[in-house]
Amino acid sequence: MEILDYLIFAIYFIVLISIGVMGMMRAKTSEQYMVADRNLGVWMLFGCLTAVFLGGSSTIGSSQLGYEIGLSGIWFVFSMGLGITLFALVFLDRIMGFKLLTISELLGRLFGTKSKLVGAVVAAIYTLLISVTQIIAIGALLSGVFDWELTTAILIGGFIVFFYTILGGMWTLTITDVFQFAIMTIGIFAIMLPQSLGAAGGFEGLKSTLPSSYFNLTEMGFREILSYLLTYTLGMMVGQDIWQRYFTAKNTKIAKSAGVLVGIYSLLYSLAMVIIGMCALVVLPGIQNTQDVFTTMAFETISTGLLGVVFAAVAAAIMSTASGTLLASSTLISKDILKDHFFTKVNDTKFLLISRITTFVLAVLAIVIALWIQELLVAIDVAYAILAGSIFIPILFGLFSKKITPNAAFSAMLLSAFTVIIGLWIEGLGASNPIIYGIVVNIITIITVSYFDKGNRRKRSDFEAGLDKS
């Protein structure tokens, strides 16, 4: 990289910090801090939703899959986008009108305090761990670009992303996400993809050089595709970071439209990334560590100035996910744990302060964990599996059935989480079967306990009566 590339990178970070300061001036209430006053239009929401789920693993991982197996690698990112779209089409009509802030708040309204607390803990741990992985990713990127020690890079990258998140909350993230979405789109679609195709001789070069298996959409195998759909599609449908973005929309129509656009964009983005990986195999067939496919290809094919934009695009993808998941974890803990159980009588001004302090503490914790574990990222697979296996079914049944009891939901969440953990322990942390086991146990438990627990059905609340009408 040349001085111009470093300058572009530096300007990018300065803009992010400046936006954080502006966001602090805008976020005066907890509602503004957590859901940006529920005032976003379709295009801003689309940019925010896209930016929050397309992180380092989506970008680096998809190009790696393209290098290793070809077009079949699109299932990784597309399964995430599909989950966001399905959430919009299946759930939004039934919940948008109730002004929720968290996924566990919905569990609480449907099934009571115990289920709300379990949901908050599981979802908060999951979102925090996602944030940790993104901090490690931004550290790795900065380390490679500036030749820093990884520890130094993690500290600097973590400080920048968490600085603007702590100050402005969702108002800051809205502005930074739209800005970062634009950088991502330009960097990948306008620069990296065409440059990679040009270096590889276009699509004809790919067809003439790569084996036919690289153009088979099911080459990874139906079992692996099913694993992605169960883990990432269901996980996205019950992810607090995704729900919180949807809650910023002005109305349900806007939210659903943005959700459909995300599904389309995820397909295009995943396609672009795997094609870049395929081009890298043609141009650089000897890459030993396939996690370096994207960065190696960028250094090989992108000219000065444009290279800075491309790496800023990668940084944008990573940092937008890190900030969004941090705020999601903070919202769950500050609202559904601290406020509900320890600070029950605080006014909104004090609650906003509690929210910022919680975000700060979690930011420090995320950086410490990132510095500590670095290579022990299998914890993410465990968190994703527990989230999808234990929370999805109670929410689905709670929204569409009148017969589920609080005891049934609580028992189903605990038993399914236990089942998933035992399954992962026996079959391995990368196995997809434990999620299936968890879902099956969840369904059996919630139906069986509800049947024998009829006498403990709660009186239908105004919230549940509203679901019946939606």
Which residues are covered by each model-predicted region?
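Membrane-embedded helix-loop-helix hairpins and adjacent transmembrane boundary segments
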Residues: 1-470
